[in-house]
């Protein structure tokens, strides 16, 4: 999705997963690629949060994508910052996951060459998406529910 937005709006994007791997490979953390998402979020979010503030203060545009953004991220920004932030959670419906699980698994490996995806089971994907959707609603976040065709045409303005 971030790549599509880059192509449409010519805005640069930052993959939080790339930041994660840079921090791990550079030795700036003892965390590993398989550390718990909660630990990785606690480590990465303060960095990402301050990048967002810097981008806004400099009146620049940046698309940030990744799963290491806490669902309660709004509490970390004043109204002045929040008015310039567009945040969306992506989730897939149970029906979509069941009908397209093989495609989901294959596409995940195309985007990020995963050495080990044994945790990418139908049950785990269903649970993760249900959790994502629930937390997005609980935190009053905008979300995109993929239910039919995976075609998202998002307007940033």
Describe every region a protein language model picked out.
Residues 18-21, 69-70, 92-98, 151:
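Conserved nucleotide-binding/hydrolysis micro-motifs of P-loop NTPases
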Residues 3-47:
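Conserved substrate/cofactor phosphate-moiety recognition/catalytic segment
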Residues 29-33, 80-83, 105-107:
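Short, hinge-like loop/turn segments at secondary-structure boundaries
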Residues 85-131:
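A glycine- and Lys/Arg-enriched "phosphate-lid" helix/loop adjacent to the NTP-binding pocket
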Residues 130-157:
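NTP-dependent small-molecule kinase module
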Residues 12, 61, 138-142:
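Residue-level detector of anion-binding/catalytic polar loops
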Residues 11-13, 84-89, 143-145:
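Conserved beta-strand scaffold positions in the cores of enzyme catalytic domains, especially
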Residues 39-92:
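Glycine-rich phosphate-binding loop used to anchor ATP phosphates in small-molecule kinases
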